[in-house]
Swiss-Prot record:
Substrate binds at R94. This is Acetate kinase. Homodimer. GO terms for molecular function: acetate kinase activity; ATP binding; magnesium ion binding. It catalyses: acetate + ATP = acetyl phosphate + ADP. Its cofactor is Mg(2+); Mn(2+). Catalyzes the formation of acetyl phosphate from acetate and ATP. Can also catalyze the reverse reaction. Pathway: Metabolic intermediate biosynthesis; acetyl-CoA biosynthesis; acetyl-CoA from acetate: step 1/2. It comes from the Bacteria. Its EC number is 2.7.2.1. ATP binds at K14, H211, L212, G213, N214, G215, D285, M286, R287, G333, I334, G335, E336, N337. InterPro entries: Ac/propionate_kinase, Aliphatic_acid_kin_short-chain, Aliphatic_acid_kinase_CS, ATPase_NBD.
Length: 411
């Protein structure tokens, strides 16, 4: 039996097939340009000999429903007995926004679909595609349970002092204006991996997890629970990101509008798509920023310093919130691969018990590794995130608790 994890976008479907017994990856793939006559399908599968093979093809795919029919058919037709046709145990879906309704993964039924649709105003770019995937798979394979795993769920443990804004309370009561946080599946995954590596019970470990990619967020994890996180009502708040500005004086919006005549929609687009690293130096690619900075580009150096300075401030803030910090965890594309970013974020934090080993930080590693000096009271860990595997784990756990595993054989 196997689990299929789905991450559905407005014109794409990313998926991964996991073995039920050990959550190992058997197949992964991407279907993009849905709605066109030249949709591109890329897939990779594990052969009996333990090697990966891959292929790519182009074909017309009208919509998500047709896309999922094609993917499910392809999922049972790989030339390897490792993924020979068998029962689907379940489908796990990444859903971006669960609001205050969903604190944990849930088996999808009509009521769950309705509630996810009700939350579309909080995530208008993501929840519609997530719902489309759920509805398509429920229609195509009604015998297989679907599980919704929410990016926001991990942060629902934040206390009111952390998630409320200092605004008139009726805005929260009537319109749900509050901090929700995102990247929760990634933060949950690396927090669990860190606790296991440190030999600490998850309900004891105090961690600062840093998911650094084109989107970036920090989370304070106390005893396995998120008690604060940098993103807010939307992913725009918090750290400087590839194209998002992060924390900003709200009056900046009004000032720019008065000076330029830009509408609120134009300002929202600018702060989400044209700001952050891209706004400072013209690119959101940290690798290019580091190359240009090394060549003496002042704007690139400024972007690099601003990015890391904001992270350092959050490390200090969350150290105060946690009281005791067992480890700082770097993950995400930048967090896992940029030694200069990790160095700039950690250097000068000795007073917080953070002492980086520069040699270990620069070495090439694979998998989880420590980069602190031996005398550092706080561990510094680099942990590759695996949101799809975490969704698979949560899907399996949720289905087993509910006792509703799919049992029909694939045709």
């Amino acid at each position: 039996m196997r689990v299929i994890v789905v991450n559905s976008g407005s014109s794409s479907i990313k998926y991964e097939v996991f073995a039920l017994d050990d959550c190992s990856t058997l197949v992964d793939g991407l279907l993009e340009r849905i709605g066109t006559r030249n949709a591109r399908f890329k897939r990779r599968w594990l052969t009996d000999s333990g090697h990966w093979e891959e292929m790519e093809e182009t074909r017309p795919i009208a919509d998500h429903h047709e896309g999922f029919r094609f993917l499910l058919d392809a999922a049972v037709r790989y030339p390897t007995t490792r993924v020979a046709p068998g029962a689907f145990f379940g489908f796990g879906h990444r859903v971006v926004h669960g609001g205050e309704v969903f604190h944990e993964p849930v088996i999808v039924d009509d009521e769950v679909v309705r509630r996810i649709k009700d939350l579309i105003p909080l995530a208008p770019l993501h929840n519609p595609a997530n719902v489309a995937a759920i509805e398509a798979l429920r229609l195509i394979r009604p015998d297989v349970p679907n599980v919704a795993v929410f990016d926001t769920a991990f942060h629902q443990s934040m206390p009111p002092k952390a998630f409320l804004y200092a605004l008139p309370h009726e805005l929260y009561r009537e319109h749900h204006v509050r901090r929700y946080g995102f990247h929760g599946t990634s933060h949950r995954y690396v927090a669990g991996e860190a606790a296991r590596h440190l030999g600490l019970p998850e309900d004891y470990a105090n961690l600062i997890t840093l998911h650094l990619g084109n989107g970036a967020s920090a989370t304070a994890v106390q005893g396995g629970r998120s008690i604060d996180t940098s993103m807010g009502l939307t992913p725009l708040e918090g750290l400087i990101m590839g194209t998002r500005c992060g924390d900003l004086d709200p009056a900046v919006h009004f000032y720019i509008s008065r000076k330029t005549g830009r509408s609120s929609e134009e300002l929202e687009a600018m702060m989400n798509k044209e700001s952050g690293l891209k706004g400072i130096c013209g690119t959101n690619d940290m690798r290019e920023i580091q190359r240009r900075s090394a060549d003496g580009d002042a704007r690139a150096q400024l972007a690099f310093e601003m990015f890391c300075y904001r992270i350092r401030k959050y490390i200090g803030s969350y150290s105060a919130a946690l009281g005791r910090v067992d480890a700082i965890v770097f993950t995400g594309g930048i967090g896992e691969n940029s030694a200069p970013v990790r160095r700039e974020c950690c250097d000068g934090l000795r007073n917080l018990g953070v002492v980086l080993d520069h040699r270990r930080n620069e070495e090439d590693w694979s998998g989880l590794h420590e980069i602190q000096r031996e005398d550092s009271p706080v561990k510094i860990l680099v942990i590759p995130t695996d949101e799809e595997r975490e969704i698979a784990r949560q899907t399996i756990q949720t289905i087993r608790r509910a006792g509703v595993a799919g049992g029909a054989r694939n045709q």
